Amino acid sequence: MKVKTILVSQPEPSNEKSPYSRLEEKYKLNINFRPFIHVEGMNAKEVRQQKIDFNNFQNIILTSRNAVDHFFRLCKEMRFAVPDSTKYFCQSEAVAFYLQKYVVYRKRKIYVGEKKIEDLEAVFKKFNKETFLFPTSDMLKPDVPDFLNKSTLNWQRAILYKTV
């Protein structure tokens, strides 16, 4: 039995020098690209309906690159200038490095965990009197909210994007 068609669950590569194009030519295959998960940002009106005012939060908890993108996109859309004093708590180093796209990277205001949100527990205890914003998708595993509740932090979840 010979394979004629391959389904790849990611967006189609923009350049022609991708390994997929070489596979197509070499083995005369038909490769279909269909992303199974699509992330759609919410607009400012939908965020305001959640009664979220970005001015009320000194700290932002970021768990993914999507959260970073949509938080800063909505800040721009709502004409909110993020203060320099804002502290960012990133679940992993990858998210922290991605944050450089929007913020000047200074060690004193970006706190990084190793892989899990629990890695930041000691840092959260230092700032337990301040308010935290937690930008998320509409679908969220209960692990992080359970941990934040257990840590007795003053935090609020903001649904900034939807997984379709």
Language model features with spans:
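Conserved beta-alpha
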Residues: 1-164
